[in-house]
């Protein structure tokens, strides 16, 4: 019985390292991760060696920093896929794709921002190197703009300030570089019911993103579609935007939004 308790305690201690990486905004050095988990660096290293073998943690060979590994990503995505909102959305995507003939994706808010949790490619050729688990920027992606527009400001404030500073430093003209401009853009997203980018995230790519709300009025997920400017209607309320928003609105209703 004592051994059983010790074994469980050992798992709990090791899990504190995974929690530290989950809360972090990026990869961590050993000493910082150990400190976040409340243990010595030597003790943390022993756990991390095992976690690396299991794929729960990865280490950058160049920087020596630790981050969540592919197995942790798979666990997180599997859990998210079991959420009712994501499951229902996945069931609706084939019909929407048949209607608009474009690539579709689902995103939820993760600990580092809007995260792609499902991806369905169309037969249309799209030069978009996006993968499950990718985190989308708030300002230059339709997905990010949708989340920034509908989440509470305190949730996105840190990431938004970082991206504004980066855009200003780079001298970008296709995204906001100050808070006032960002707020105006996000107000337009809320007014139109969807977010759109053209050539902003990827050259020659257009994307729309529509929000899905739960019964409590909170943003549950976002539905994104993207395609080449050659085959994708970029018009507001056009052949892509309208059915995308309609699908998102129906899904919100099925989740109980607006019925209270």
Q: Each predicted region: which residue ranges?
A:
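N-terminal helix-turn-helix
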Residues: 1-86, 249-257
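Short glycine-/small-residue motifs
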Residues: 56, 116, 221-223
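A structural signal for short hydrophobic beta-strand segments in well-ordered beta-sheet cores
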Residues: 57-59, 106-107, 212
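All-alpha effector-binding/dimerization core of bacterial HTH-type transcriptional repressors
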Residues: 77-125, 150-153, 185
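Short, solvent-exposed recognition segments
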Residues: 126-201
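Cysteine/selenocysteine-centered motifs that mediate thiol-based redox chemistry or coordinate metal-sulfur cofactors
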Residues: 158-172, 245-260
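Extended hydrophobic
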Residues: 174-248
